[in-house]
Amino acid sequence: MLLDEIKRMSYDELKRLAEDIRKKITEVVLKNGGHLASNLGTIELTLALYRVFDPREDAIIWDTGHQAYTHKILTGRDELFHTIRTFGGLSGFVTRRESPLDWFGTGHAGTSIAAGLGFEKAFELLGEKRHVVVVIGDGALTSGMALEALNQLKNINSKMKIILNDNGMSISPNVGGLAYHLSKLRTSPIYLKGKKVLKEVLEKTEIGFEVEEEMKYLRDSLKGMIQGTNFFESLGLKYFGPFDGHNIELLEKVFKRIRDYDYPSVIHVVTKKGKGFTAAEEDPTKYHSAPPSEKPKMLSYSELLGYTLSRIAREDKKIVAITAAMADGTGLSIFQKEHPDRFFDLGITEQTCVTFGAALGLHGMKPVVAIYSTFLQRAYDQIVHDVALQNAPVLFAIDKSGVVGEDGPTHHGLFDINYLLPVPNMKIISPSSPEEFVSSLYTILKNLDGPVAIRYPKESFYGEVESILENMKKIDLGWKILRRGKEAAIIATGTILNEVLKIPLDVTVVNALTVKPLDTAVLKEIARDHDIIITVEEAMRIGGFGSFVAQRLQEMGWQGKIVNVGVEDLFVPHGGRKELLSTLGLDSEGLTKTVLTYIKARSREGKV
């Protein structure tokens, strides 16, 4: 595999290989979609790293996993790389199901250092001599979990090597004090000039790097005078850098020198997000996760959120918007442009975002916390303890709910209904269309008197923002019977309703806009007229909307057949949305088969 070949290559050959990999990644991602900018920035870093460390022996952990395409290419997946993010193909993230060289499955930011500590202690207890290397971005480093683990390194005598991939970005530009500190480290001209002169002098001596280490007090004094305390060194870690993340020869020398150090080290590497692809370099946020290039421009629910909140906030000065390093991903960059003083990007800090929103709400504001469904679960304690327990008026805009497609199991938003349903005071709204979405937002914000969650999909659609917003109005947040039939009743929540409406059977169809509370009046009417009720949700079936409906029907003493349709007890793989819905039996064809099964069973038995 390429992993062996790169160790024999000259630096000129490595540079050519880097350009070949850059070309391959660009071509495949522009076709399949994927994380382009972050991967173009880590090619040289990965090549240098794998010249020194071997993932077959050493635990190399890629935080978040969205910058590991070169890792995949080098570790035996070069021939399959064209399948990345396609149904049945390679995952867009690091996963142990795909390769034993993917030491730890990732997809959410900030987990790598804690995982590295776990591997390191396992190796130690088992008497295995292996290195542990973590590659983490400066954006992920701001997450609470990463900082918690960083704080433990010295305490448990770790020897971990942390490669800080600093490109000044997560998805949106990084914010906060740590981002400012890293900026100072990589840009201080006096320090960089002084360090360069000192290093040149030392390298001319016979004992070179060893002298530099012995004269560490001089280097530290230089840094201290210019920059103040180094954050990493204040935690008892050794800090090296910053280094050019695109200089393979330099990085290889650095990695060789620190490989066998017996103390925890941070190697600060500065890279260019989108390196080598001009469009991605100029707009790394746009190309962080690039859609297939041939996909026509459509409007997303995320963008619609931004436009809707901006419009409502013109009249309601109490509305504020909060996100966790996802200004563009959640559509809130649209709100930010019009209302910058009421927009807050707190970095990769979902827990902080929720509690921050709770306090805003408790003092008279109307906070909208916009976070992807898969990331909101990281702040569950704060949702329960800080928001719901105090009945704080917070609107959770749960983006990317349901099946998200190519990003796969780490990003599907299939658990939000299940983890929010049992929370007291929480209301859950699941619109079925863009028009219902904007009117639901308008209605909720007109009378936000407690915690409300509105969930909506990753899907895009054809539509004009202005025409949708012109029809925004206050609506009844209840259920509606859209059509009546005799064979069975189907209660669907969310945009999966559109698949239900395609079922060519004589069935009643109910649009359940509210997941919680249930619309008991409509439910009683349906129960009176039907002996088969089928619930459909694009979420986990166990403990979901259907279970909630079944419980209520049982309490009502209803004697019919209740069928809950949703995602079974499994982690859904990656692939196109249509392919996944078909596989899960949640497209119109699969739903039709399910409904027919129960209708036919009743006919055969003369009962349900």
From Swiss-Prot:
InterPro entries: Dxylulose-5-P_synthase, THDP-binding, Transketo_C/PFOR_II, Transketolase-like_Pyr-bd, Transketolase_C, Transketolase_CS. SUPFAM superfamilies: Thiamin diphosphate-binding fold (THDP-binding), TK C-terminal domain-like. Pathway: Metabolic intermediate biosynthesis; 1-deoxy-D-xylulose 5-phosphate biosynthesis; 1-deoxy-D-xylulose 5-phosphate from D-glyceraldehyde 3-phosphate and pyruvate: step 1/1. Binds 1 Mg(2+) ion per subunit. Binds 1 thiamine pyrophosphate per subunit. Pfam families: DXP_synthase_N (PF13292), Transket_pyr (PF02779), Transketolase_C (PF02780). The keyword Magnesium applies. Thiamine diphosphate binds at residues 66, 107-109, 139-140, 167, 277, 350. Its cofactor is Mg(2+); thiamine diphosphate. Keywords: Isoprene biosynthesis, Magnesium, Metal-binding, Thiamine biosynthesis, Thiamine pyrophosphate, Transferase. GO terms for biological process: 1-deoxy-D-xylulose 5-phosphate biosynthetic process; isopentenyl diphosphate biosynthetic process, methylerythritol 4-phosphate pathway; terpenoid biosynthetic process; thiamine biosynthetic process. The keyword Translocase does not apply. Its EC number is 2.2.1.7. GO terms for molecular function: 1-deoxy-D-xylulose-5-phosphate synthase activity; magnesium ion binding; thiamine pyrophosphate binding. Mg(2+) binds at residues 138, 167. NCBIfam families: dxs (TIGR00204), PRK05444.2-2 (NF003933). Homodimer. PANTHER family: 1-D-DEOXYXYLULOSE 5-PHOSPHATE SYNTHASE-RELATED, 1-DEOXY-D-XYLULOSE-5-PHOSPHATE SYNTHASE, CHLOROPLASTIC. Catalyzes the acyloin condensation reaction between C atoms 2 and 3 of pyruvate and glyceraldehyde 3-phosphate to yield 1-deoxy-D-xylulose-5-phosphate (DXP). This is 1-deoxy-D-xylulose-5-phosphate synthase. It comes from Thermotoga petrophila (strain ATCC BAA-488 / DSM 13995 / JCM 10881 / RKU-1). The lineage of its organism: Bacteria, Thermotogati, Thermotogota, Thermotogae, Thermotogales. The gene is dxs.
